[in-house]
UniProtKB/Swiss-Prot annotation:
NCBIfam families: FeS_CyaY. This is Iron-sulfur cluster assembly protein CyaY. The keyword Metal-binding applies. GO terms for molecular function: ferric iron binding; ferrous iron binding. The gene is cyaY. Keywords: Iron, Metal-binding. InterPro entries: CyaY, Frataxin/CyaY, Frataxin/CyaY_sf, Frataxin_CS. Involved in iron-sulfur (Fe-S) cluster assembly. May act as a regulator of Fe-S biogenesis. Belongs to the frataxin family. It holds the Pfam family Frataxin_Cyay. GO terms for biological process: iron-sulfur cluster assembly. One of its GO terms (cellular component) is cytosol.
Length: 109
């Protein structure tokens, strides 16, 4: 059964909230230097070196797109998991690794 727009937004919003919460914890515990800007369908993280990770919801496709300084990635919801369309990697471990590589911040979910 196809996912509805409402279901998509709920799943995506839950992930955005988990990322924001983990970053807030990292800021408190690691004195991490990262700015979070959540606006509409976009969650933008800016690091001390000026680089950014942009995570956005693509409602028409029911995908989450992520842009890092290493490339762009598209995640679709498959069998209960957000998976990269190219390599099948899971979203949250990918985000953890990207934030560590790009910003030097270790997140715990």
């Amino acid at each position: 059964m196809a996912m509805t727009d409402t279901e998509f937004h709920q799943l995506a919003d839950d992930m955005f909230q988990a990322i924001e919460s983990a970053i807030e914890t990292a800021i408190d515990e690691q004195d991490a230097d990262v700015d979070i800007d959540a606006s509409g369908n976009v969650l933008q993280l800016e690091f001390v070196d000026g680089s950014k990770i942009v995570i956005n919801k693509q409602e028409p496709l029911h995908e989450i797109w992520v842009a890092t300084r290493f490339g762009g990635y598209h995640f679709g919801f498959v069998e209960g998991k957000w998976l990269d369309g190219r390599n099948g990697g899971e979203f949250m471990p990918f985000v953890q690794d990207s934030i560590l590589r790009q910003g030097g911040i270790k997140l715990s979910f």
